[in-house]
């Protein structure tokens, strides 16, 4: 597999590291860098933990580019059983974060490489999935993320432990995190107010195998490619197309004409599609850059606002033109109704 120069450089920088982390902007090929590092570690048994919407992509990636490995979808119980007893040959098991900690069999693995795609998913140390990942004993760990901390270094601690840095949380906070005690008439609690010794922290990250790259730092970028995300057809959509009527969230959709049937069918494929919304959330969470989302219907707008409620939101439609979040927050999400955004908008900040 032919890699770009900056990808080869990333592998060279981690060639002497037992663990590695590739904190690269979206579009710089973390998938290829991570899978090559996995191959170079040379373990017979390997697991990849990713977001649910990415399982199929990872399976296809390894099947296409690493034909000497047996690939198992560990969300499938039969594949899981086969993976745990697979003899002799090299194998890769792929599973999502939400299911991994329920697969107790994985604790039995020894002498294996573990790769975490979007490793920012384990930033919460008290979450079951984070505790489970920290309990495993891989020979090598690979972390991939475009947003390892989203600018908040207190969320980096669990990833540092996976990279092999044996620093206590107390020592980490005392050295790198500024905090203070506050009380608003109730119990006293500690809040993060800033950071210190950041240059030293970044140097430590590199020492333990972390490599960083922003898109603008890579001189020879590959030609841009459009990547399609496919969502599954829901049972609600199938039922509506058959019966022309369905009730969702106390709302009855009736396709009593060709036009209304087509209109509601489109809604069922967007605002009412749980799989599509889930994939969108995963996509937004994979970057800390500005994101632009175009939509058609008000029902879509409400679903989108709920889905990305943890990010600063701007909205442009026939009734509202609010671009404050877009202008002032580099991690904002801008929701634009197709017709309202057809002309007259400069959105170049969203690279």
Language-model features: locations:
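Walker A/P-loop
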Residues: 17-37
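Conserved P-loop NTPase motor "coupling/switch" region that bridges the ATPase
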Residues: 44-45, 113, 121, 130-216
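Conserved helix/coil segment N-terminal to the catalytic DExD/H
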Residues: 79-113
